[in-house]
Amino acid sequence: MSIVQLDHVSVTFKRKKAADVQAVQDVTLHIEKGDIYGIVGFSGAGKSTLVRTINLLQKPTAGDVVVGGVDFVKDGKQVISGKDLQARRRKIGMIFQQFNLLNETTVIENIAFALKHSDLSDDELEEKCHKLLKLVDLEDKANAYPAQLSGGQQQRVAIARALANDPEILLSDEATSALDPQTTIQILDLLKKLNRELGLTIVLITHEMAAVKKIANKVAVMENGRVVENGNLRDVFLAPKAELTQKFVGGSLAVVDTLKSLNISLAENEALYQLVYSLNNVAKSIIIELYREVGVEASMLYGNVEVLADEPVGTLLVMVKGDADKQKATLKFLSDEGVTVTELDERGNRL
């Protein structure tokens, strides 16, 4: 079941002395409960504007927004009351590139600030804050001030604060962009842990495909306010259709570059296939087994292994020699082995 439904959402910024800016254009995304949904694109693509329509920090000018089964926006008009929206927002945590901590208060006081409207007693409040600090591995920093913390530690405090009201959804807007690579990995690992242990749905806004590749299970690629491609991470990453997605991913371009450098000309009995398969499920050599079982010669032209959300996935580009019956048998064998096959022409285009 979708916990977030964005249907035909658009955001247009009106300007008096210049043309209107269409920041988001006719975007439809359905995010399931428990997803880590990556939204990736270059600066100015509309990612941050789009994610803010989920909690109505940015009101759409068109389309529908439904969160947790509750209508927020219908046909570009807010239909949820201000009071109800305030209550629902407490179930949607959000973290940013800037940590937005209160510098004059301690770590534990920063977290407690998010609970100032709760009904918790002082003892219950302190207990909850310490529990949140433990969750983000900062138990020993309760009485420290933000200036005494590293960037990664400050982001952990921001995450703990965002979790204070037990949200169902966490919106992460470029939360790792200001961090070094090692700290970025640590924060992404923490988000993955929260998703796993709390069942937290996470919407991950980033311009870094590596971040999406590491923890997301689904991805949408944005350009000029539009979603140009979206789907399961494995499908989008390993068989990108849009040109922008290919630029982000790189793997598809590597196949094209390989074919360009080899300058292949296929004979009538030859075919090019891109093979994609999980190394967890297919441990044996596909090329050797193909020869043994089908009796065709397969030449490997390109090979690569990517780790997608902790799953090692292999990509091979092979040229198979054989008549029509052999090619048909090849496709059946590979399909039976759990291999995703895409036939390509000499330039790397899908057939």
Swiss-Prot record:
UniProt domain ABC transporter: residue ranges: 4-249
Q: What is the lineage of its organism?
A: Bacteria, Bacillati, Bacillota, Bacilli, Lactobacillales
- In which compartments does the protein localize? Cell membrane
Q: What is this protein called?
A: Methionine import ATP-binding protein MetN
Functional note = Part of the ABC transporter complex MetNIQ involved in methionine import. Responsible for energy coupling to the transport system.
The SS bond pairs are: none
**Membrane topology term:** Peripheral membrane protein
State how it assembles.
Answer: The complex is composed of two ATP-binding proteins (MetN), two transmembrane proteins (MetI) and a solute-binding protein (MetQ).
Q: One Pfam family from the UniProt entry?
A: ABC_tran
Which source organism does the UniProt entry give?
Answer: Lactobacillus delbrueckii subsp. bulgaricus (strain ATCC 11842 / DSM 20081 / BCRC 10696 / JCM 1002 / NBRC 13953 / NCIMB 11778 / NCTC 12712 / WDCM 00102 / Lb 14)
